[in-house]
């Protein structure tokens, strides 16, 4: 029987878990690290799952229909996922994003036919959100999916990402770590894993330069995709057991090490997540345990950033 897909929506989800054995050997780790390569989704990131879920939900409710305009504030990846699906379904897409986001992300959005509205970088995601809300009032038949507040975000991970990790590890997962942007990934995966194994440790990773979860204060940082500067509505703050603060340099170093030891090129937030997994793998009490880190996207969206230029 031929295995041919009609379009790419059916390809979203089920990227593999990979054990970076060379990296583990290089660092002398005695815990097992498994990385989930979410950049293998059709539009290149974990946010494909969220974009699909939010658009599907809006269509089913009759909110999104022919002639509708999708407007969304994004740091890049959700916008790319939405732009990809909007192109396939014939919707107009307008994305607002901080001007500090990489040139590559902007160019990808343009390639999908989306319109980009850049906002002041110092205002972070709050500025992008405010601009999206302003545009929605001006443009008829517009719809803001609202990744920071839309329950479809965490639901997508609770119904897909979490079960995939559980199945692929045969339930052998002790620690799960993911960066917090909207909080949807950590919430959905964390809730599912704890429903199966209550003592799974869920670790929320945030930028050390913007410790909103741990210290209640935001700030500028270089880890694109996480650390929005506020606590998102989507985030279940009771689901994580610990918070790991990743600094810019260790995230960059981990991403570079993964490329040089495994031939896997990942993005900035992926490097940060990996750095957290490495830190936990080095702890004596975690010897023999399995640590799963979710890597949101690939390095090809960051060639113009310090990840590759420094």
Task: Put a short name on every predicted segment.
Residues 1-310:
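PLP-dependent amino-acid enzyme catalytic core
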């Amino acid at each position: 029987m031929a295995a041919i897909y009609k379009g790419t929506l059916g390809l979203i989800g089920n990227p593999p878990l990979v054990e970076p054995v060379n990296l583990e050997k290089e660092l002398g780790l005695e815990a097992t690290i498994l990385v989930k390569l979410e950049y293998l989704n059709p539009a290149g990131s974990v946010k494909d799952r969220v974009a699909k879920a939010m658009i599907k939900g809006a269509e089913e409710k009759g909110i999104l229909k022919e002639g509708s305009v999708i407007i969304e504030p994004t740091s890049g990846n959700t916008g790319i996922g939405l732009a990809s699906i909007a192109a396939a379904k014939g919707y107009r897409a307008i994305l607002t994003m901080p001007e500090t986001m990489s040139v590559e992300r902007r160019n990808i959005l343009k390639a999908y036919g989306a319109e980009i509205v850049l906002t002041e970088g110092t205002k972070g995601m709050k500025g992008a959100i405010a601009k999206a809300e302003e545009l929605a009032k001006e443009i008829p038949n517009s719809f803001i999916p609202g990744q920071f507040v839309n329950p479809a975000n965490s639901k997508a991970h609770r119904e897909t990402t979490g079960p995939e990790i559980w199945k692929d590890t045969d339930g052998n997962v002790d620690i799960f770590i993911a960066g917090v942007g909207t909080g949807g990934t950590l919430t959905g995966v964390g809730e599912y894993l704890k429903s199966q194994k209550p003592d799974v440790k869920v670790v929320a990773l945030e930028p050390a330069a913007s410790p909103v979860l741990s210290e209640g204060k935001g700030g500028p940082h270089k880890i694109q995709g996480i650390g929005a500067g506020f606590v998102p509505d989507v985030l279940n703050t009771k689901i994580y057991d610990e918070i790991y603060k990743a600094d810019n340099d260790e995230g960059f170093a981990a991403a570079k090490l993964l490329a040089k030891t495994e031939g896997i090129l990942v993005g900035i937030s992926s490097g940060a997540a990996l750095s957290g997994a490495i830190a936990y793998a080095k702890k004596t009490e975690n010897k023999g345990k399995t640590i799963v880190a979710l890597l949101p996207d690939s390095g090809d969206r960051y060639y113009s950033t310090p990840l590759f230029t420094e």
